[in-house]
Swiss-Prot record:
It catalyses: tRNA(Gly) + glycine + ATP = glycyl-tRNA(Gly) + AMP + diphosphate. It comes from the Bacteria. PROSITE patterns: AA_TRNA_LIGASE_II_GLYAB. This is Glycine--tRNA ligase beta subunit. It comes from Lactobacillus helveticus (strain DPC 4571). Coiled coil: none annotated. Pfam families: DALR_1, tRNA_synt_2f.
Length: 687
């Protein structure tokens, strides 16, 4: 007969972000433990709060299945020597089945005698196996661990109680001096301890003691109560899954309430108010029906509605203290012109191995001007970029950003607007940090995109130059994210940038104006390859077929926009009827060139043509040389494919005449160079 098994670890408050992954780990480890021990079960449910990690194993078998089976071993000639003594092979076979050599017997199978044993074993009781749950606790891992008392044992937080019930029976799992029983604890302030008669009583018994053990139920309670408040007051709130998740794991019994603050604080930029409420206090900001931020907030307490007025008043006082600070910083910062802050950047270090923030600004402007010229950007964009690049780091030395570091860029935008800067300049100051995460929003303005790319290129170049290069396991300065951001912006703006050409030019340009150590030689290509690797990340993220990704990245192409264009062409035509013969023809050419070890240093000489097919191929290839679009180039290959086949039919490539042979190889090399713009087509999986 199967019964439910309850296992609860009661602790001091666990950080909210650690709770969900910890209870999942407990469930995963338990699932593996039960399967390894041959205990059947239906499923594992999880319960979790800041003070408990709990699993409920549904329909757990009371014992392992009994074993009654015949095990086949090695051949008889291997199990006994000439004198009939048991060999080590026989002893090992018997021992592996929990038997002795006395239990071995022989039977013939297809003309050969083999050793057998008849294994009969009664399954172990679940109650005995479950004592091993203590090993699961000891094996659990966490971002940080704590010790308590004088023990060496570590856990995410000190353990205060354990519950271990198999149906109605206690399984006395033990950790340190704590032995599991049937007593659990209710809410720290509102509930009492409760003795569980049966594992199935857990959820309802805790509800009576003001603990909602089911995290999804707590989340639903929070959402429903918030919706009631919003509807009642004609407000709006913006969904914030991360904050909702956090408050769900901060409380055991949620009660939602609304508070307010003086309207005078609404003169502060919205982002400051939201940061003060959300990041510092875990409040949800509130908007009116028109989507405008208003002087109210919604919060969640860990308790019931008793004394709620006192709770609201206390939360309002804490928030007002923070808003007073924010108002002071805002007023103080606005007393000075932007030039005051820009001048102070001379004394702000970008990195002690690289130089000051002012020096970085100088480099970024040069990089941006170089890129703008390369991309032939409009004069007004260049003018706005130059001004934005002069200002874009000034808010780092403002008091507001000193208090709210996460608002760098945002406050720069607001202060620039207040100072009368052009909107494009102001917005670019904010956008240069974008994308802030790998898949975060990209800059929406051209100036912002240019500034972001220039800033990130400078960061990568100077960090590589200083020897601070990411390893496979360590990237403390987020250089991979910066490189991926560069790739995403370039592709979004459709800007061409072959890094193997551009980086040496940028580094050479910066060499005479910056004291920062810059990369040289192989390091330049190392940076180009580093950024190019992020193109692979982009292609994989956007669901390109793995063989297409391998093919386009195996080409000599260094321009992300061209690599993406090649991937799009190959993905688009991958299933076309003519795709296979085109790829096979081009791959055949590459194979011939590799086998001949041809280096391509011979020009095609038309006077050496023997057959009309050579003239035809030469003319067609000449026409393809001028095609810029990879989509058009592919179509050119479609039409070229029968010409290539005819060329092979009519000509012996490895002709006895050395000049003719090299001339034909040179023709094939010209085709191969064009095909390389699409990638190494031999890596494509063609069916």
């Amino acid at each position: 007969m199967a019964k439910d098994y309850l296992f609860e670890i009661g602790t001091e408050e666990i950080p909210a972000h650690v709770v969900p992954r910890s209870v999942k780990q407990l469930a995963d480890r338990t699932r593996k433990f039960l399967k390894e021990n041959g205990l059947k079960f239906k499923d594992i449910k999880t319960f979790s709060t800041p003070r408990r990690l709990t699993i409920l194993v549904e329909d757990l078998a009371e014992k392992q299945d009994d074993i009654d089976e015949v095990k086949k071993g090695p051949a008889k000639k291997i199990t006994q020597d000439a004198d009939g003594n048991w060999t080590k092979a026989a002893q090992g076979f018997a021992r592996g089945q929990g038997m002795t050599t006395d239990d071995i017997y022989f039977e013939e199978l297809k003309g050969t005698e083999y050793a057998y044993v008849h294994v009969q074993k009664e399954g172990k009781k679940a109650s005995d196996i479950l004592l091993g749950m203590s090993d699961i606790i000891k094996a659990m891992t966490f971002p940080t661990k704590m010790r308590w008392d004088s023990n060496d044992f570590e856990f995410v937080r000190p353990i205060h109680w354990l519950v271990s019930l198999f149906g109605s029976d206690v399984i006395p799992v033990k950790i340190l001096d704590i032995t599991a029983g049937r007593k659990t604890q209710g809410h720290r302030f509102l509930g009492d301890s409760v003795v569980l008669a049966n594992a199935d009583d857990y959820e309802d018994a805790l509800k009576d003691q003001y603990v909602i053990a089911n995290a999804e139920e707590r989340k639903d309670m929070i959402v429903n109560q918030m919706n009631e408040l919003v509807k009642k007051n004609h407000w709006q709130i913006k969904p914030d899954r991360d904050l909702l998740e956090e408050v769900t794991y901060l409380v055991e019994y949620p009660t939602v309430f609304a508070g307010s603050f003086d309207e005078k604080y609404l003169n502060i930029p919205d982002e400051v108010l939201i940061t003060s409420m959300k990041d510092n206090q875990r409040y949800f900001e509130v908007y009116d029906e028109n989507g405008k931020l208003i002087n109210h907030f919604i919060a969640v307490r860990n308790g019931n509605k008793d004394y709620l007025d006192n709770i609201i008043s206390g939360n309002e006082k804490v928030l007002v203290a923070r808003l007073d600070d924010a108002q002071f910083f805002y007023d103080e910062d606005r007393k000075y012109p932007l030039s005051h802050f820009v001048d102070r950047l001379k004394n702000v270090s970008f990195h002690d191995k690289i130089g000051s923030m002012a020096e970085k600004i100088q480099r970024v402007r040069m990089i941006g001007d170089y890129l703008a010229k390369r991309w032939d950007l409009p004069e007004n964009v260049v003018t706005d970029f130059d001004r934005a690049s002069e200002l874009y780091k000034f808010d780092l030395v403002t008091q507001m950003v000193g208090e709210f570091a996460e608002l760098q860029g945002v406050m720069g935008m607001h202060y620039a607007r207040l100072a009368g800067e052009d909107e494009e300049v102001s917005v670019a100051i904010k956008e240069h940090y974008m994308p802030a995460t790998a898949e975060g929003p990209l800059p929406e303005t051209t100036v912002g995109s240019l500034l972001s790319v220039a800033d990130k290129i400078d960061t990568i170049i100077t960090f590589f130059g200083a020897g601070m290069i990411p390893t496979s396991s360590n990237d403390p300065y987020a250089l991979r994210r910066y490189a991926y951001g560069i790739v995403r912006i370039l592709l979004n703006e459709k800007w061409s940038l072959p890094f193997n050409e551009v980086l040496p030019e940028i580094i050479n340009m910066l060499g005479g104006v910056t004291p920062a150590k810059l990369p040289k030689g192989d390091s330049e290509q190392e940076i180009a390859d580093f950024i190019r690797d992020r193109v692979k990340q982009y292609l994989q993220k956007n669901k390109f077929k793995y063989d297409i990704v391998d093919a386009v990245l195996a080409s000599s192409q260094q321009d992300p926009s061209q690599i993406l264009a090649a991937a799009n062409v190959l993905q688009l035509h991958h299933d076309d009827e003519e795709f296979k013969p085109v790829v096979e023809s081009l791959t055949r050419i590459n194979n011939i060139l590799k086998k001949a070890k041809f280096n391509g240093k011979v020009d095609v000489d038309e006077s050496l043509f023997v057959d009309n097919s050579e003239t035809e191929l030469y003319a067609r290839v000449q026409n393809l040389q001028n095609i810029e679009s990879l989509a058009d180039l592919y179509q050119g290959f479609v039409h070229l494919q029968p010409v290539i086949d005819q060329y092979f039919e009519a000509n012996m490539i490895m002709d006895k005449d050395e000049n003719v042979k090299n001339n034909r190889l040179a023709q094939l090399y010209a085709v191969s160079e064009l095909a390389d713009r699409l990638g190494d087509l031999s890596k494509l999986v063609i069916k």
